[in-house]
Protein backbone atom coordinates (compact mmCIF):
# COMPACT_ATOMS: atom_id res chain seq x y z
CA UNK A 1 0.00 0.00 0.00
CA UNK A 2 2.81 2.39 0.89
CA UNK A 3 4.51 1.62 -2.42
CA UNK A 4 1.31 2.39 -4.34
CA UNK A 5 0.87 5.71 -2.51
CA UNK A 6 4.50 6.64 -3.08
CA UNK A 7 4.29 5.80 -6.77
CA UNK A 8 1.04 7.74 -7.09
CA UNK A 9 2.62 10.79 -5.44
CA UNK A 10 5.62 10.66 -7.78
CA UNK A 11 3.36 10.33 -10.80
CA UNK A 12 1.24 13.26 -9.67
CA UNK A 13 4.37 15.36 -9.13
CA UNK A 14 5.66 14.56 -12.60
CA UNK A 15 2.31 15.43 -14.16
CA UNK A 16 2.26 18.72 -12.25
CA UNK A 17 5.66 19.63 -13.67
CA UNK A 18 4.51 18.80 -17.17
CA UNK A 19 1.36 20.84 -16.72
CA UNK A 20 3.20 23.90 -15.36
CA UNK A 21 3.23 26.68 -17.97
CA UNK A 22 6.66 27.43 -19.45
CA UNK A 23 8.02 30.93 -19.00
CA UNK A 24 6.83 33.15 -21.85
CA UNK A 25 9.49 33.84 -24.46
CA UNK A 26 9.97 37.48 -25.44
CA UNK A 27 11.55 38.31 -28.80
CA UNK A 28 12.87 41.85 -29.18
CA UNK A 29 13.20 43.13 -32.73
CA UNK A 30 16.52 44.96 -33.31
CA UNK A 31 16.53 47.42 -36.23
CA UNK A 32 19.96 48.00 -37.75
CA UNK A 33 20.48 50.10 -40.86
CA UNK A 34 23.96 48.67 -41.48
CA UNK A 35 24.80 45.28 -43.06
CA UNK A 36 25.93 42.17 -41.20
CA UNK A 37 29.54 42.83 -42.23
CA UNK A 38 29.50 46.07 -40.21
CA UNK A 39 32.23 46.19 -37.56
CA UNK A 40 29.79 46.10 -34.61
CA UNK A 41 27.36 43.50 -35.92
CA UNK A 42 28.97 40.34 -34.54
CA UNK A 43 31.00 41.60 -31.54
CA UNK A 44 28.29 43.95 -30.24
CA UNK A 45 24.82 43.35 -31.71
CA UNK A 46 24.99 39.57 -32.01
CA UNK A 47 26.97 39.19 -28.78
CA UNK A 48 24.33 41.17 -26.90
CA UNK A 49 21.64 38.89 -28.34
CA UNK A 50 23.58 35.76 -27.37
CA UNK A 51 24.47 37.01 -23.89
CA UNK A 52 20.92 38.18 -23.11
CA UNK A 53 19.44 34.82 -24.13
CA UNK A 54 21.97 33.11 -21.86
CA UNK A 55 21.44 35.46 -18.90
CA UNK A 56 17.65 35.06 -19.08
CA UNK A 57 17.68 31.30 -19.71
CA UNK A 58 16.15 31.86 -23.12
CA UNK A 59 13.25 33.96 -21.83
CA UNK A 60 14.39 37.07 -23.73
CA UNK A 61 15.82 36.87 -27.22
CA UNK A 62 16.90 39.51 -29.71
CA UNK A 63 16.25 39.10 -33.44
CA UNK A 64 18.44 41.38 -35.52
CA UNK A 65 17.06 42.92 -38.71
CA UNK A 66 20.14 44.22 -40.55
CA UNK A 67 20.48 46.42 -43.66
CA UNK A 68 17.26 48.31 -42.97
CA UNK A 69 15.04 45.21 -43.09
CA UNK A 70 12.45 46.94 -40.88
CA UNK A 71 12.51 50.10 -42.96
CA UNK A 72 15.04 51.81 -45.20
CA UNK A 73 16.74 55.03 -44.25
CA UNK A 74 18.93 55.59 -41.18
CA UNK A 75 17.26 58.95 -40.52
CA UNK A 76 14.15 57.12 -39.24
CA UNK A 77 16.01 54.77 -36.92
CA UNK A 78 15.14 56.61 -33.71
CA UNK A 79 11.46 56.83 -34.62
CA UNK A 80 11.38 53.09 -35.29
CA UNK A 81 12.09 52.55 -31.60
CA UNK A 82 9.67 55.29 -30.51
CA UNK A 83 6.81 53.82 -32.58
CA UNK A 84 7.88 50.29 -31.66
CA UNK A 85 8.40 49.13 -35.19
CA UNK A 86 11.41 47.65 -33.42
CA UNK A 87 11.97 47.26 -29.69
CA UNK A 88 15.65 48.16 -30.12
CA UNK A 89 17.21 50.41 -32.74
CA UNK A 90 20.73 51.49 -33.69
CA UNK A 91 21.37 54.92 -35.17
CA UNK A 92 22.81 58.41 -34.92
CA UNK A 93 21.26 61.19 -32.83
CA UNK A 94 22.71 63.63 -35.36
CA UNK A 95 20.03 62.60 -37.85
CA UNK A 96 17.43 64.05 -35.47
CA UNK A 97 19.51 66.91 -34.11
CA UNK A 98 16.59 68.88 -32.70
CA UNK A 99 15.67 65.95 -30.43
CA UNK A 100 19.14 65.65 -28.89
CA UNK A 101 20.62 69.16 -28.52
CA UNK A 102 22.42 68.41 -25.25
CA UNK A 103 23.72 64.99 -26.28
CA UNK A 104 25.27 66.43 -29.44
CA UNK A 105 27.32 69.00 -27.55
CA UNK A 106 29.91 66.22 -27.25
CA UNK A 107 30.61 66.63 -30.98
CA UNK A 108 31.81 70.22 -30.71
CA UNK A 109 35.55 70.91 -31.13
CA UNK A 110 37.57 70.89 -27.94
CA UNK A 111 34.95 69.20 -25.73
CA UNK A 112 36.75 65.87 -25.47
CA UNK A 113 40.21 64.35 -25.83
CA UNK A 114 39.23 61.12 -27.59
CA UNK A 115 36.50 58.54 -28.17
CA UNK A 116 36.90 56.86 -24.77
CA UNK A 117 36.92 60.19 -22.93
CA UNK A 118 33.86 61.38 -24.86
CA UNK A 119 31.94 58.18 -24.17
CA UNK A 120 32.70 58.36 -20.45
CA UNK A 121 31.58 61.99 -20.35
CA UNK A 122 28.26 61.10 -22.00
CA UNK A 123 27.51 58.47 -19.37
CA UNK A 124 28.69 60.66 -16.51
CA UNK A 125 25.83 63.07 -17.22
CA UNK A 126 23.37 60.56 -18.70
CA UNK A 127 21.00 60.39 -15.73
CA UNK A 128 21.21 64.06 -14.79
CA UNK A 129 21.14 65.79 -18.18
CA UNK A 130 20.67 63.49 -21.16
CA UNK A 131 18.02 60.86 -20.38
CA UNK A 132 15.26 63.46 -20.57
CA UNK A 133 15.98 63.77 -24.30
CA UNK A 134 15.11 60.11 -24.87
CA UNK A 135 11.34 60.43 -25.06
CA UNK A 136 9.60 57.03 -24.86
CA UNK A 137 12.95 55.26 -25.18
CA UNK A 138 15.93 54.26 -23.04
CA UNK A 139 19.59 54.39 -24.10
CA UNK A 140 21.23 50.95 -23.98
CA UNK A 141 24.48 52.23 -25.45
CA UNK A 142 25.76 55.64 -26.49
CA UNK A 143 29.29 56.27 -27.70
CA UNK A 144 31.37 58.27 -30.15
CA UNK A 145 33.80 57.59 -32.96
CA UNK A 146 37.34 58.98 -33.15
CA UNK A 147 37.74 62.52 -34.59
CA UNK A 148 36.23 63.15 -37.99
CA UNK A 149 38.47 63.60 -41.01
CA UNK A 150 37.89 65.33 -44.32
CA UNK A 151 37.53 62.84 -47.17
CA UNK A 152 37.90 64.54 -50.54
CA UNK A 153 37.20 63.18 -54.00
CA UNK A 154 39.70 65.24 -56.03
CA UNK A 155 41.08 68.19 -54.06
CA UNK A 156 43.51 68.00 -51.12
CA UNK A 157 42.75 70.25 -48.15
CA UNK A 158 45.93 71.74 -46.70
CA UNK A 159 44.53 74.93 -45.16
CA UNK A 160 41.07 76.21 -44.23
CA UNK A 161 41.19 78.45 -47.29
CA UNK A 162 41.11 75.32 -49.45
CA UNK A 163 37.59 74.58 -48.16
CA UNK A 164 36.07 77.83 -49.37
CA UNK A 165 33.00 77.19 -51.50
CA UNK A 166 33.31 73.39 -51.46
CA UNK A 167 30.27 71.24 -50.75
CA UNK A 168 31.02 68.96 -47.79
CA UNK A 169 28.73 66.34 -46.30
CA UNK A 170 27.82 66.92 -42.64
CA UNK A 171 26.16 64.43 -40.31
CA UNK A 172 24.46 66.89 -37.97
CA UNK A 173 23.60 70.53 -37.42
CA UNK A 174 26.64 71.00 -35.18
CA UNK A 175 28.94 69.59 -37.88
CA UNK A 176 27.23 71.80 -40.47
CA UNK A 177 27.82 74.88 -38.32
CA UNK A 178 31.52 74.04 -38.03
CA UNK A 179 31.89 73.55 -41.78
CA UNK A 180 30.17 76.88 -42.40
CA UNK A 181 32.67 78.53 -40.05
CA UNK A 182 35.46 76.90 -42.07
CA UNK A 183 34.12 78.49 -45.27
CA UNK A 184 32.59 75.34 -46.78
CA UNK A 185 29.00 74.72 -47.82
CA UNK A 186 27.59 71.93 -45.64
CA UNK A 187 25.24 69.34 -47.13
CA UNK A 188 23.43 67.17 -44.60
CA UNK A 189 22.69 63.62 -45.71
CA UNK A 190 22.71 60.08 -44.29
CA UNK A 191 25.99 58.17 -44.43
CA UNK A 192 24.39 55.66 -46.79
CA UNK A 193 24.10 58.32 -49.52
CA UNK A 194 27.64 59.69 -49.33
CA UNK A 195 29.25 57.13 -51.67
CA UNK A 196 26.98 58.02 -54.59
CA UNK A 197 27.09 61.74 -53.81
CA UNK A 198 30.90 61.80 -53.77
CA UNK A 199 31.21 59.58 -56.84
CA UNK A 200 28.90 61.81 -58.90
CA UNK A 201 30.20 65.13 -57.60
CA UNK A 202 27.05 66.12 -55.73
CA UNK A 203 29.45 66.84 -52.86
CA UNK A 204 33.18 67.48 -53.01
CA UNK A 205 33.90 65.60 -49.83
CA UNK A 206 32.65 64.46 -46.46
CA UNK A 207 33.41 65.12 -42.81
CA UNK A 208 33.18 61.65 -41.26
CA UNK A 209 34.88 59.13 -39.02
CA UNK A 210 37.66 57.04 -40.55
CA UNK A 211 35.66 53.84 -40.15
CA UNK A 212 33.37 55.10 -42.93
CA UNK A 213 36.16 54.52 -45.44
CA UNK A 214 35.50 50.79 -45.15
CA UNK A 215 31.97 50.59 -43.74
CA UNK A 216 30.47 52.66 -46.57
CA UNK A 217 33.26 51.95 -49.11
CA UNK A 218 34.25 55.62 -49.20
CA UNK A 219 37.82 54.50 -49.77
CA UNK A 220 36.79 54.18 -53.44
CA UNK A 221 35.68 57.76 -54.27
CA UNK A 222 38.12 59.29 -51.74
CA UNK A 223 41.50 60.41 -53.07
CA UNK A 224 42.64 62.67 -50.21
CA UNK A 225 42.15 62.59 -46.44
CA UNK A 226 42.89 65.53 -44.15
CA UNK A 227 43.51 64.69 -40.50
CA UNK A 228 44.30 66.82 -37.46
CA UNK A 229 40.99 68.65 -37.23
CA UNK A 230 39.79 69.63 -33.74
CA UNK A 231 38.10 66.72 -31.97
CA UNK A 232 34.78 66.26 -33.76
CA UNK A 233 33.44 62.74 -33.20
CA UNK A 234 30.19 61.25 -34.43
CA UNK A 235 27.78 60.07 -31.76
CA UNK A 236 25.99 56.72 -32.10
CA UNK A 237 23.37 55.04 -29.95
CA UNK A 238 21.38 51.90 -29.31
CA UNK A 239 17.96 52.70 -27.88
CA UNK A 240 15.06 50.61 -26.61
CA UNK A 241 11.36 51.35 -26.58
CA UNK A 242 10.48 52.27 -22.99
CA UNK A 243 7.25 50.25 -22.83
CA UNK A 244 9.01 47.17 -24.17
CA UNK A 245 11.61 47.55 -21.43
CA UNK A 246 8.94 47.87 -18.73
CA UNK A 247 7.20 44.73 -20.00
CA UNK A 248 10.25 42.63 -19.11
CA UNK A 249 10.26 40.96 -15.71
CA UNK A 250 12.43 42.60 -13.02
CA UNK A 251 15.07 39.88 -13.26
CA UNK A 252 15.20 40.12 -17.06
CA UNK A 253 15.48 43.92 -16.89
CA UNK A 254 18.38 43.44 -14.48
CA UNK A 255 20.02 41.05 -16.95
CA UNK A 256 19.67 43.60 -19.76
CA UNK A 257 21.01 46.40 -17.54
CA UNK A 258 24.04 44.28 -16.71
CA UNK A 259 24.90 43.83 -20.39
CA UNK A 260 24.37 47.42 -21.53
CA UNK A 261 25.32 50.95 -20.47
CA UNK A 262 28.84 52.32 -20.11
CA UNK A 263 30.64 49.00 -20.54
CA UNK A 264 28.92 48.18 -23.83
CA UNK A 265 29.43 51.76 -24.99
CA UNK A 266 33.18 51.81 -24.30
CA UNK A 267 33.68 48.50 -26.08
CA UNK A 268 31.70 49.73 -29.09
CA UNK A 269 33.69 52.96 -29.22
CA UNK A 270 36.99 51.08 -29.22
CA UNK A 271 35.88 48.67 -31.95
CA UNK A 272 34.90 51.65 -34.11
CA UNK A 273 38.30 53.23 -33.46
CA UNK A 274 40.19 50.05 -34.36
CA UNK A 275 38.21 49.74 -37.57
CA UNK A 276 38.92 53.37 -38.40
CA UNK A 277 42.66 52.73 -38.11
CA UNK A 278 42.27 49.86 -40.56
CA UNK A 279 40.44 52.13 -42.98
CA UNK A 280 43.26 54.67 -42.89
CA UNK A 281 45.73 52.00 -43.98
CA UNK A 282 44.25 52.09 -47.49
CA UNK A 283 45.95 53.71 -50.47
CA UNK A 284 44.89 57.29 -49.92
CA UNK A 285 47.01 60.42 -49.82
CA UNK A 286 46.93 61.81 -46.28
Regions found by a protein language model. Name each.
Residues 15-16, 104:
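Residue-level detector of alpha-helical hydrophobic segments embedded in or interacting with membranes
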Residues 18-24:
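Sec/Tat signal peptide C-region and signal peptidase I cleavage site
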Residues 1-11:
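Bacterial N-terminal signal peptides that target proteins for export
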Residues 11-12, 22:
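Cleavable N-terminal signal peptides
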Residues 25-116, 125, 132-286:
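N-terminal secretory/targeting leader peptides
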Amino acid sequence: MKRILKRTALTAGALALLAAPAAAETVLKFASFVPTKYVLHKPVFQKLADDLAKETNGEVKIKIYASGALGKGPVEQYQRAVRRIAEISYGLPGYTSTVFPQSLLIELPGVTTGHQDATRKLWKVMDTHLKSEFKRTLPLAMFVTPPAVLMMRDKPIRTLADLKGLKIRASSKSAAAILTAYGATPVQMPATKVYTSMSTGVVDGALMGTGSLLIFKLIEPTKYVTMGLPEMPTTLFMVMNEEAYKELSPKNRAALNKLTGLGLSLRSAQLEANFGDLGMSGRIEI
